[in-house]
């Protein structure tokens, strides 16, 4: 899995929740940071992306000081609900520090 050396744990997403092979779609030109809409550990997020039929994933997940990786950077994670953006982006899901209605994210 190609990615950051800052990762503390790697958990491969289910193959049906991302697209294998980014090179035919162009280079990485953006980073997307998205919140989980929940208070989740990197293991919780990894299990979510391993769920058959989830149809979603991220390259990385951050919870506290832990960084998880779920999809290789040479593959396309399904994070943005926008195909062209997904093709260009490395995506990072962050755990929330609280819930609705404000969904805060801690530093």
What are these model-predicted stretches?
Residues 1-107:
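Active-site-adjacent loop/helix surface patches within enzyme catalytic domains
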């Amino acid at each position: 899995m190609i990615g950051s050396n800052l990762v503390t744990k790697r958990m491969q997403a289910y193959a049906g929740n991302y697209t294998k092979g980014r090179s035919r779609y162009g280079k990485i030109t953006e980073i997307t940071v998205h919140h989980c809409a929940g208070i989740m550990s990197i293991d919780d997020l990894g299990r979510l992306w391993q769920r058959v039929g989830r149809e979603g994933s991220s390259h990385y997940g951050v919870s506290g000081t832990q960084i998880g990786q779920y999809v290789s950077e040479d593959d396309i994670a399904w994070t943005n609900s926008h195909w062209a953006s997904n093709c260009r982006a490395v995506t990072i899901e962050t755990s929330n520090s609280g819930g609705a209605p404000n969904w805060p994210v801690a530093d």
